[in-house]
Every structure is written in structure tokens, then in C-alpha cells.
Amino acid sequence: MNSFALLLVCIQACLVQSVFSQCTSRAAVAADRGIIGGYGLGAPCGLGYGLEAPYGWAGYADYGYPAGAYGIDAYGGIGEGNVAVAGELPVAGTTAVAGQVPIMGAVKFGGDVCAAGSVSIAGKCACGCXEGYGYGLGSPYLY
């Protein structure tokens, strides 16, 4: 097997692992095994000044602000943003939508297509994102 085929097999294995995995919490893996907190890697002494400690990569080191407060973090489901799409969108057929979708906001359409309507999105993630133990880097402290 040449190296390119081996690379493709490794990439496929990572994709399969990503598809069939579920991240429920960092605490389930880290906190009860002593990796973070207590006397593990997140402890205040020894290796505690590593990745997850207050003065490590996620904390107040020489890298600027802590990652949890001002840097990389999971989307908490609260906020507002703009999306712009440009290009040709050939659409044909019939679309039927039934049911209740409680959303708030608006969508603007422009161009050669005669379209009108409104779409809005409001809410908060039910998965607990940005709530202490969540997805992403989050807060430097597992509280």
C-alpha cells in the first residue's frame, strides 16, 4: 500500500469516527479520571500550569486573553449575524411545508427571481453549549 492510499485510509477512519461519535461533556472524560482538577493536569501545582490550568494555554499566559472569555468558544445559541449569498440558484419544483416552526427574523431576496417571504431564527441550544461543561474550548475552569 503506498503512502497516499494509507493517508486516505487514515482520513476515512477519522471521518467515520467523527460521524459516529458524540461529545456529551468534557467532564465525563476529564474530571472523574483526575486529568483536570484535583491533583491531575488541571491541579494548581506541578502539571497544573498546562493546557487547562488558569495560567496555561487556556488561561492568562503570554498569549493574551483567556481562550474561554475572548477567544475560541462554542456557539451558545444567542446572538445575531448576517449571511450573504450571491450567484445563480436554479430552483424548480414544488415545496410544501407543514407544521409549526417558531422563529423570528427576516430574509431579503433580490435579483431576477420573484420571491418574497420571511424566515427568522431565535432560541438557545438545548445541548448545553457554552454552559460550563460543553463543546469547544469553553471556559478555562471546569465549574
From Swiss-Prot:
Molecular-function GO terms, alphabetical: structural constituent of egg chorion
GO cellular component annotations of the record: egg chorion
Signal peptide: 1-21
GO biological process, one term: chorion-containing eggshell formation
Keywords linked to the UniProt accession: Repeat, Signal
Superkingdom of the source species: Eukaryota
Repeat listed as a keyword: yes
Keyword Lipoprotein: no
Classification via InterPro entries: Chorion
Physiological role: This protein is one of many from the eggshell of the gypsy moth.
Family: Belongs to the chorion protein family.
Protein name: Chorion class A protein Ld5
Organism of provenance: Lymantria dispar
